């Protein structure tokens, strides 16, 4: 403390304890600064922290419990007292864009996913703008692998929201970073097949069913149909090379063919698709199964006039050099 002597009195100045500093901001209805300050205390980045005793773990526990109580108060305040009384769509979007991310970030900093997916979710899902902002906040944490396990009821809303807003690329990326038990597989597969999110389809087959052959067969069927529909044949490819592919197929069909090449290459190299590694005890089986699929004499649902080695023929016709590199 500091004592200042004046002409007619003296003044005592004291540094507030960490708890008093938190309470001061709460009483001033300045919850965002309060959450930021509490986060600094918790991550050991706060300045002039007074009043905390014990081990580092004990301090974190005390601060964490305090900030959770602050968070629950804030959830009530921001959806009632602080809620814009007269606001259009833009005002509401800006309001929730300001208040939702700090709440999500605090829960993850405190490692309290239970609170995030219970009290915080329940508070924000009642308003469509708050709900949308909450779901979009999850994206960065999913992609950074901080959130791999999410309740299925919430991922269902996440998938629905991203499909409605046509954020297909972001949705596909997020699906491949979530553990499969977090997903409603029927819902996700329907969305992925509808919009051609092949990475996510492969990921679910590989990680949810340990099936590395079916996705290849399904994607081969689509590519073969596309090449047949375009009037593409092997002699044209021999005469014109890869350029003949780009002229006759759409960009999405070419992308599919390239994905197939990369997927097969990953499987034969013991690498997971689209990232990571295949479990050691699965590598040999995956290599054998995928190689057998690639060199199959006929496809799974072969027509009577199907030529032999349809999958090899398809990739050789699509991109000879690419297949040889594989």
Predicted regions and their residues:
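Extended non-globular scaffold/tether segments
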Residues: 1-326
